[in-house]
Amino acid sequence: DISDDGDDTDGNTTDDSTDIDIDPVPLIEVTKTASVTDDGNGITGTGDVINYVITIENKGNVTLSSLTVTDSLTDANGVSLVMGNGPYFSGANQGSGLGTLLPGEIATYRAYFIITDAAALTGAISNIATATASSPGQTNNVSDTSDDGDDTDGNTTNCLLYTSPSPRDKRL
């Protein structure tokens, strides 16, 4: 006897395979963190660089393709800001190239923004990243919006950085 699935009503009572179905689970998690490179004056504000690190982890059991990352950057008044650079692909911990994520793999993207006087005057900069990918046989069916890596702090969708107006700003 090689194997038997225990179902004698299927017509084969001696050698039939035991099948276990594994359902595909496409799932990603996007995390974004931010740090500020100060321009030397010791105050977060105009001229400082906000460095963003975006990680996308494939938490599912299938390889994902066509991975794209979009970024929305706004000031505290909701005015759209233009990212200085990025998000751009920095690498993946299992060696996949741009746009592909193996199960369990983490891809890293980076971006930065140089704080302008106008953005600093609003007091905050908000940044949200969204990743979208395709699972086998599907198109753009997997997505997630960034959190800051700590879902317990109530800040589950963006990174806020409070800024100070530039001392060079004569409008104060």
Residues covered by each model-derived region:
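Terminal edge beta-strands and adjacent linker/stalk segments
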Residues: 1-23, 141-161
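Extracellular beta-sheet repeat scaffolds used for adhesion and glycan interaction
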Residues: 8-9, 13, 39-40, 73-115, ...
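Short, solvent-exposed loop/edge segments of extracellular or virion-exposed proteins
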Residues: 31-40
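Short beta-strand elements of extracellular/lumenal beta-sandwich folds
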Residues: 47-62
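Short, hydrophobic/aromatic beta-strand segments
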Residues: 62-70
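Short glycine/proline/serine/threonine-rich loop/turn segments at secondary-structure transition edges
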Residues: 117-126
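Conserved small/polar residues in nucleotide/adenosyl-binding loops
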Residues: 162-169
